């Protein structure tokens, strides 16, 4: 945990201080005091790594990204490689990633911590908007790394939206059966032509149908996913509640609202799971993170 910077400093000869000398430099018991720019919180985190927890009763634990950045800057400044490595490991911890993934991504790129950068990129997908306000840490990374983050998000958006547009992934059986197949001509419904269809030996193909409210939900889901490529986007409370309200108001003579509502809730969960799987298939940000 030693710092070569301080190690070399302590070997320098110190001038003898005479009582008659007039100096404004602070001293303690005749020894010069070195002022450090870091605050007590940052130095406390570093010292917690220099002394065993059994002696101090403290373990290295930062409370937020701001504290972690300060420790990284100090560790780099004083050439404390072990402290730097421990601090970089904190970048991959979920609490830190959830707090501000864009800022964590910038720090990970700045300090070439590729694992944390890839994790942070994935966590940014949970943000309804990638950058809601100015992030100073982005100034310290190459524009190419920011471009890769934006490209990754765009690829995830395309992957998620494809599920809202092309419905061939839907299996209209089991718990989802009540959603498809209604043929009540008095209600607004549309044939789902890109759903997996049932083919008969004669070659006739049976297309499935879905009510207009379902298509409205899928269209709105696509709009939300275009800015928020995350499984939770299609579980948005208003989005789901509006669809459930439409189910209750449809008054279909052939469909029981309670069964359709239950099937729809099951569909939403299946939709979200498929989004997670599709996004997981997107090629992650390059591990080398070159500019």
Where are these regions (language model features)?
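Extended aliphatic helical segments
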Residues: 5, 33, 62-65, 71, ...
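Post-BTB helical module
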Residues: 45-140
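Long, charge-rich C-terminal accessory regions
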Residues: 129-235
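BTB/POZ (also called T1 in voltage-gated K+ channels) oligomerization domain detector
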Residues: 1-60, 209, 213-291
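Generic structural signal for short, flexible, solvent-exposed coil/loop and linker residues
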Residues: 23-25, 32, 38, 67-69, ...
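A sequence-composition feature that detects small, non-aromatic residues
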Residues: 70, 74-75, 87, 106-108, ...
């Amino acid at each position: 945990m030693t710092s070569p910077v301080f190690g070399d400093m302590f070997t320098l000869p110190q001038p003898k201080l005479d009582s008659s000398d007039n100096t404004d430099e602070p001293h303690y018991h005749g020894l010069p005091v070195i002022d450090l720019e870091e605050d007590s919180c940052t130095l406390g985190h570093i010292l917690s790594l220099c002394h065993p927890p059994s002696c101090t009763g403290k373990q290295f634990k930062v409370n937020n990204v701001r504290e972690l950045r300060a420790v990284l800057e100090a560790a780099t400044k004083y050439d404390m490689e072990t402290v730097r490595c421990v601090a970089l490991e904190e970048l991959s911890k979920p609490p830190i990633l959830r707090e501000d993934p864009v800022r964590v991504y910038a720090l990970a790129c700045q300090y070439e911590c590729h694992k944390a950068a890839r994790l942070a990129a994935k966590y940014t997908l949970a943000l309804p908007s990638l950058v809601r306000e100015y992030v100073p840490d982005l100034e310290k990374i190459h524009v190419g790394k920011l471009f890769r983050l934006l490209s990754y998000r765009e690829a995830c958006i395309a992957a998620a939206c494809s599920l809202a547009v092309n419905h061939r992934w839907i299996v209209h059986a089991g718990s989802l059966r009540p959603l498809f197949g209604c043929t009540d001509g008095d209600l607004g419904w549309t044939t789902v032509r890109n759903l997996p269809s049932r083919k008969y030996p004669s070659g006739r193909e049976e297309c499935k149908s879905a009510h207009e409210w379902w298509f409205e939900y899928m269209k709105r889901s696509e709009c939300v996913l275009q800015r928020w490529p995350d499984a939770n986007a299609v579980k948005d409370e208003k989005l789901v509640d509006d669809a459930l309200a439409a189910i209750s108001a449809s008054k279909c003579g052939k469909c029981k609202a309670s069964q359709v509502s239950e099937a729809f809730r099951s569909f939403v969960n299946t939709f979200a799971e498929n989004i997670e799987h599709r996004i997981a298939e997107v090629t992650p940000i390059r591990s080398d993170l070159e500019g």
